[in-house]
Structure formats: C-alpha cells, structure tokens
Amino acid sequence: MALDRSDGLNSLGFAKAPADTRVVVAMSGGVDSSAVAAQLADEGYDVVGVTLQLYDHGAALAKKGACCAGRDIHDAARVAETMGFPHYVLDYENVFKDAVIDEFADSYLAGATPVPCIRCNERVKFKDLLETAKDLDADCMATGHYIQRKMGREKAELHSAADAARDQSYFLFSTKQEQLDFLRFPLGHLESKAETRALAAKYGLSVADKPDSQDICFVPNGNYAAVIEKLRPGAADPGEIVDIDGNVLAMHRGVIHYTIGQRRGLGIGGLDDPLYVVKLDPDTRRVIVGPKEMLSTRTVPVREINWLGDTPFDSQQEWQMDVKIRSTRPPRGAVIRPVSATEAEVELIVAEEGVSPGQACVFYAPEGGRIFGGGWIHKG
C-alpha cells in the first residue's frame, strides 16, 4: 500500500517510522475504508479511526448498503476492535443537513440534478473531518476512495485510480491543494476491488464480503423525491408537460421527479417519435420535452471552479483538456476557456447529450490521468 515511497520515507511519505506517524482513517464501515485502516495498523502506524454519524432518517438507518448508517458504525467499531486501534463516532447530523441535504433538496426544486456525494466530500469529510484529524495531531488522513495521490515536481497531484471501473475522481474534483497535501488514498493503485476484499479477508474482517454502498446514502431505497417532499412540502406540486411550442401533452406529478434526458415515465403515448426531457422550468412547474437531437450541446457553462493546475487557471486564454460531464461517462476532448479564476465556458469537441445543471464538469489531462480540478455546470 505504498504511497510517495522513496529512500527514507515510510509508505505514507513521511521521514519517520510508522509508529511515530499518526493517521486518522475516515471509516464508513464499508470494506474499502476498513481495509485501509487494517493495513495501516498492520504496518505499525498510529491509527485512529473516525466515523461520522451523518443522518438519522428513520428508514435510512436500516437501509442495506447505506453509508454511515447504524449498522455501518457498528461494523467500523468491530474493525477497530479486531485490529486494536481507537475508534470514535462524531455526530455530524446537523452539519451534514446544512451543508449537503438542504442544498440537495433546493437544487432539485430549482430544476437541477445535484451530486450530493461531491458536496459531502468537499464540505464535510475533507473540511470538518480533516480539521478534526489535525486537532488529533495526525500527520495525515487516509480514506478508502479509489483515486491516486502522486507527487509531482512541485506538489502533490490528483490522479485517476488504477482501476478505471472504480475510479472516483469525478466525486473528488473539488479537493483543494492544501487538503490534498494532508490526504492519502491507499487503495488508488489497486487493480481491482477483489484486491481490497482480499486484504479485508487477510485480516479476518467481518466486512470482507459486505456489499458495496449504493445510491445516495441518506435516500432510502433510492426514493429521493420522498426525501425532498419531506424536507420541502409542496415540492411535488403537479404541472404541465409541454412540447417546445408550448402545447400541453400531459400532466406531471412534480418537477422533482424529472431530469434532463429522461425518456421513461413521462406518460406520453401515441406519438410517432420518442420525446425526452430537454428543459425543466420550476417557476412555471413545466417539464419541456422534445426530440433527442435537442439534448445535444457543445457549450457547457461552468462555475465554482476548483483548479489544481501548476499555473493559475486564468493565466491562459484556453486549455486543451478532456472533461467528464457525468460520473458514468468517459472523459472527452474539450477546450476550456476561462471567464474568470472560477468560471469558464467549456466547448466540447463532440456534442454530448443530457448535459444537466447541477452535475460536475471535471477536467483531466489528455494523457496520464491527472485531474486538474473542475466545476459545476449551470444554466447559461
């Protein structure tokens, strides 16, 4: 599990013995962070496990595969007991609601399609938890994310995971340089999830065969609309489904049930050609549908840019890079034109469908897998 290793440095990149290196491990109770904690403890590091209690939404606590639910806290504690290191649970429910859940609900109300996992990493795990790690006199904080931290000529760099199928770089683009300096990602170099499970089995951890977490952690059974309705009464008020000319085709059961590019579940039949959601208008509660070709675009406005390059983002008129506009899509060629230090117009070389406000646009080097940051797609 070597990171930044060279002569005189331990596997976490420090010039001292593992026993003299304190590392806080962010433990979700899943197999990934558990394997990280176990291996580091086995290597002799001064490991401190920390689990965040993020929510208590009734059914969410019992949701199989949820992150940091009641059973997951128990699993993390068992791993710590097995490997002989201290483990703490911190109540971050109010922080999580203010920083992540409220924005998630409001984004859907505004017609966007948010990615709460990015905000959680940005505003909770890599902010408050990282500061807690420093308060515990840790030298670094390790997580179970599948991404690589590599040392460049001048500073630590963020790189895609060796296992492309597990790569989580899309969800970590907003990591700041000062955070990256303190973070470690011991699983990023592994070729497959099977290697992680083998590590957990090697140490006799009960989570070795635990299923991966699925969907959004605080949304029971994937029913995000029910969560939004609970948080924002009236969010599911009905409205009209109209075509691009404003003709009413059907009624819908709330804008929050729809996303850009959606085809299924529109309740529109008897048409010669399929229709897709091409726009959401929350002010009029209208869902606008049109032909598939209307989903294609080459221009993507991006703001709140976090830049991890070696020179200032706005020091050039344009950057030739690859970008990823959804977590499930591969990076594609683009020209990024800075408007300011935190805003840009991204021109896709080949048009893509379903570019949605609220999603992230992540910047990658054309070769080598380095992540240069990214920003949030918004309405132009």
From Swiss-Prot:
InterPro entries listed in its UniProt record:
MnmA-like, MnmA-like_C, MnmA-like_central, MnmA-like_central_sf, Rossmann-like_a/b/a_fold
| Chemical reaction(s) catalysed | S-sulfanyl-L-cysteinyl-[protein] + uridine(34) in tRNA + AH2 + ATP = 2-thiouridine(34) in tRNA + L-cysteinyl-[protein] + A + AMP + diphosphate + H(+)
| GO MF annotation: an example | ATP binding
Q: List the disulfide bonds.
A: 120-217
- Where is the segment annotated Interaction with tRNA? 166-168
Residues where ATP binds: 26-33, 52, 144
Q: What is its EC number?
A: 2.8.1.13
Report the protein name in the record.
Answer: tRNA-specific 2-thiouridylase MnmA
Species of provenance: Jannaschia sp. (strain CCS1)
Tell me the gene name.
Answer: mnmA
